[in-house]
Amino acid sequence: MRILVTAIGSMSASRVISSLQMTGHYVVGIDIYPKEYHEEGYLCNSFVQVPFFNDPNYCATLIDICRRYKCKAIIPLTDPEIDVINANRAIFEEKKIALYMQSSEILDIARNKLKIHEFFKADNEVNTINTYLLSDFHTYYVKRPWILKKLHGRSSEGVVIDPTINQLLTISNMDDYVIQPYLDGHIFTVDYIRDKKSGFDYSVAREELIRTSNGAGVTVKTIYDKTLADMASFIGNKLDINGSINIEFIKHDDKYYLMDINPRFSGGIDFSYKCSGYDFVLNHCRCFCSDELEPVRKYESKILIKSYEIKSGN
């Protein structure tokens, strides 16, 4: 099959491209930057430079690329692209282009930090962090320190730890921010996959030992923790996930708290593949093609590091 993959400069792209090509798929990669700016541009079977996701012609451009290259499906790799494609599902469906991503109902929750808290706060199986719209903050008492986040934020954008009252008062669009009690602790992230038809699910967890300022783990320790696996499974089943997502937790006072749900491949999806041998990308596609998923694979705890290689772009 010919598949269009967006944002091939993102951290998950090389794993996605490799997994698709290993199983015979033809990959058309797109990005806002020229092919020469990313090694992944050369890994793709074909590459097309496209406008920013917020360009009025973005979706029309994707549809035109699918027409020219005979792509039958799209795999978006970043949240903003998922948001704009989700808002324009009808035009992709009209052209019979499959979207290998979560449903609108799931995205409505997963891309909203307040709704995540509201959706799971009554469940004993998941520990959530109390979350309030900044515009409603005066009606609640939250013990300091606080953490300020964008309501629909990604990659730690807009995060302010323990903001002052004056800082809060300078924010004009308060409905676009949430505030939470700040929890100190270690970050754990879970790559999770679920087949909606059969109910089969599987996950690989890792502790992020070194994490960039935008929330990407570059040195991690893979672990198996039944508590994390059970929480991820509960979240996936309650949301009725189909395909692969990433779930972030923070361990505070010996408890795991749900931080975020990323409705896409994590930037560290290659860590899970290298550790377990389980191909989340291939099996994600199978969830949308009525194919049987790979069975569960046991994996060992190990420390993995992200490495980089300098190459010429010419």
Could you say what each language-model-derived stretch is?
Residues 156, 209-215, 219, 262-276:
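Glycine-rich phosphate/pyrophosphate-binding beta-alpha loops
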Residues 1-100:
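ATP-binding N-terminal substructure of ATP-dependent carboxylate-amine bond-forming enzymes
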Residues 107-186, 196-199, 226-229:
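Active-site nucleotide/adenylate-binding loops and adjacent lid/helix of ATP-dependent enzymes
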Residues 4-5, 73-76, 130, 178-181, ...:
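Short catalytic-loop micro-motif centered on adjacent basic/acidic residues
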Residues 37-40, 58-60, 102, 107-113, ...:
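Short, charged, surface-exposed secondary-structure boundary motifs
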Residues 69, 224-314:
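ATP-dependent carboxylate activation and anion-phosphoryl transfer catalytic cores
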Residues 159-240, 250-251, 255-257:
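Phosphate-binding site of ATP-dependent enzymes
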Residues 33, 78, 151, 182-183, ...:
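Anionic group-transfer/hydrolysis microenvironments
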